Amino acid sequence: MKSAFLFLFIMFSGITLSQNLKFTIKNQKDTTVHLIKYFGTKKFYADTGELKNGVVQFDGSKQANGILGLLMPGQKYFEFIYNNEDIEFTTEGPDYLGNLTIQKSDENNVFIPYIKFIGSQKSKMGQLGKQRASLDAESDEYKALTTQINEINEGVVAYQKNIINNHAEKLVSKIVKMSTEVLIPEAPVDANGDIIDSNFRFTYYRKHFWDNVDLTNDALVNNPIFHNKLEYFFGQNMMIQHWDTVTKFAFEFCDGLNPTSKMFEYSVGWITSSFGKSKIMGMDKVYLEMLNRYYCTNNLEGESPAFWVGEDKFEDLCDNLKNKLRLTIGSKPFNLYLKDTSDQVWVDFYSLNSDYTILYFWDPECGHCKKTTPKLETLYKEKFKARNIEIFSVGKAIGDDFGKWKKFIRENKLTFINAAITDRLYTDAKETPEKFVPLYPGEPNKPTTLESLNYQNTYDIFSTPKVFLLDKDKKIIAKSISISQLEEMLDRLQGFEDLPKLFPPDPEEDAQMQKKE
């Protein structure tokens, strides 16, 4: 008898019991309905089912824990928590949430009343806020309404604390806790009662920002609250929007996550994508540093940490990454050793003893270049040259472009440095590269470098014109700026901000010279 019981225990212990999600929708015609899921703030179809005789069911074992929703015809839907349990609801439209009753689900016996309560309190506060908006802040009526609003808010906080304290083992508790703010203690004071650190509250808040979020629980990613907190933490309210600052906090945060988790996937993916789209000059460094650390550098297992990215995507993400990192603000780019218009003299920009150096890449056949290059010459003659600002321009001069390049320089009387891979240099270097570039580290007496001969790749030049502004140490301080922005910036940097501007902002030119590849 004992052996038979043991056999049955072993047999049934190997069976995975799937969770059933059952919904009864009263007075609803047979139709197709969808289960929806979150990944951050984005909604996706999780499953599709057929509502027949008012009932539809889904296999819960196919779903990740978190917030799910049932999408009805007419884009009506209601949300609920799924956490590896059977669920059975009954409801009726059009107010599916308001009419919802729960036959089975421990999580939602807590969650559904909570969101109904939050909805009602939010409505009350909205009405009181509208009444208060038209009143004098010193009036008794204004103060009375403020008291009512505060009382409602206190009631919400008390409700949340009750869930957090009495249902700690449930996912609903973790979701509610994630939505609450960290409590900040009073700032320390000295013997005289004066605050020791005026930044204490801000520093404490940032340091403890994630205290109410269980970063080990992937279910919290399947919820817009986590995304909103991530977005706020890396925004201007929590840190200076400087590439080095953001990168530092991004590394600290992501390195502290389980590298095989959805929490890691979402956080790394969002930070990388978000700062890759940033319009703030210099923030591309965050994007590139994130790529370098989490996508393009293998871990100890010899694999990319970005386990969610398909193999076919890595080439695009990681192509030319090392060069791109040398083109970020604060970095010193590769020197360029090229020929001048005589096709005899080698020139480079590291040797320029200038306070600022403008690297300017252009093409004599480029329509925008035909407008911007003469403007740059005007600035050089009338402002920059006398202020020890040099321009090192690199033009396209291979094949027929060599003659066009020289003709444009001559006709527009360009007096700044004009360099290029000339047609002869291109041909000779292609036939006998050993005469021009080092074949091994430390090899002496070679006039140029592989980076110079491949300058388009080195400087990521796939459209022209393109500008880099370097300081006296030849470090990049600005890039992809227009002629008017260049003039304004250099006037300001050298204390001439009150000088009349030769070139006012040109929206078309600005857009062309600022666009990302």
Regions found by a protein language model. Name each.
Residues 1-24, 479, 497, 516-517:
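Bacterial Sec-dependent N-terminal signal peptides
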Residues 19-168, 175-179, 183-212, 216:
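A non-transmembrane, solvent-exposed segment enriched in polar/low-complexity residues
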Residues 65, 176, 414-417, 459-468:
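Structural micro-motif
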Residues 307-349, 441-445, 488-491, 495-496, ...:
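N-terminal "domain-start" segment that seeds a small globular fold
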Residues 337-357, 381, 456:
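A short beta-strand-turn-helix
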Residues 346-376, 390-392:
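Short active-site neighborhood of thiol/selenol oxidoreductases, capturing the structured segment around
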Residues 371-412, 420-433, 451-454:
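Structural microenvironment flanking redox-active thiols in thiol-disulfide oxidoreductases
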Residues 428-492:
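Thiol/disulfide oxidoreductase modules built on the thioredoxin-like
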